[in-house]
Amino acid sequence: VVEAASGIRFGEFLEKRLFGPLGMEDTGFFLPYEKRERLATVYESVQEQKLKPYEQDHLGIRISACPNPFESGGAGLLSTADDYFRFADMLLNGGKNGDIRILEEETVRFFTGCGLDSKRQESFSQWFGLDGHTYGNLMRILTDRKLAGILGSAGEYGWDGWLGTYFVNDPVRKITLIFMTQKKDFGTSNLTRKIKNIVFS
């Protein structure tokens, strides 16, 4: 849809409208050769308490000499903690990066507002680690702190990636937490929850 509406590739659109204005110089679907030594190794569990490097292609996450032909709206970006913070901070500031307007405030409210009916909420609640949350139009939203069993504020929002990239914005406390691992299927793990509780305590 983005490519049809804009007339350019999805990655180019993100660079022009989001990454560039936010100064996210290390974010994209393709990792240039000169930056590859900075890339963290991805791991997977092979036995309890043991890891090995993950070498498969999944969700468009791959490192090759050629740009990925499929630029997904849900996976495949490479980034850094600093760049991710710029994105999260823009959302926390209602769509602004300093004096630069990236998204309209109404758009940010739409992204971070509740969007599930009762049937879909029942299905969403079965995801591991997301008790006490709902899903908005972009990410998870905390609705019941006691049910979630975590510290935080009702209305906080964020998401986690398949390799354990986790972020949360708390608009009440004005806190952003970014936690990055490189392990497949890490998601909203117990470790992530413990770290969040430490930071928010």
Q: Where is each model-derived feature located?
A:
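Short, structured beta-strand/loop micro-motifs enriched in basic residues and often containing a Trp
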Residues: 158
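Short, surface-exposed loop or secondary-structure junction motifs
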Residues: 1-151
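Short, well-ordered beta-strand micro-motif
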Residues: 140-141, 168-170
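Generic C-terminus detector
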Residues: 182-201
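Short, well-ordered beta-strand elements
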Residues: 166-168, 174-183
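Short, small/polar residue-rich loop motifs at catalytic or cofactor-binding pockets
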Residues: 161-163
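Extracellular/periplasmic catalytic domains that process cell-envelope and extracellular macromolecules
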Residues: 132-133, 169-171
